[in-house]
């Protein structure tokens, strides 16, 4: 049984590597209550990872109604979100705690 499992995994592993390479990553930083970059881009129809690092001394809440995500980022902390494949378009995001200064748009093409 162990040999057949090992053989199966050995044969399937090369197929998994190209699929993992297809995932795009967007990295955002919050500093002085501003997203950097505030206008990131990502490829359409692929899973997406968004990483948000908060360099401010206060908490932030990354939120996007169009992306269907909402997560608190502690001061000096970092969060990672896995996003479903997206259609081309613009997806607005903001810091719910500082909406007047902290927002941006993800362009998917």
Regions found by a protein language model. Give the residues of each.
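N-terminal signal peptide c-region/cleavage motif recognized by signal peptidases
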Residues: 14-18
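Bacterial N-terminal signal peptides that target proteins for export
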Residues: 1-7
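Extracellular/periplasmic metallocenter environments
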Residues: 20-27, 34, 73-109
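Beta-strand-rich interaction surfaces with strong enrichment in secreted/lumenal proteins
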Residues: 38-40, 68-72
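Asparagine-centered strand-capping/turn motif at beta-strand->loop junctions
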Residues: 52-54
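Short beta-strand/loop motifs in extracellular/secreted proteins, especially
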Residues: 48, 58-60, 102-104
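Structural beta-strand segments of beta-rich domains
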Residues: 38, 46-50
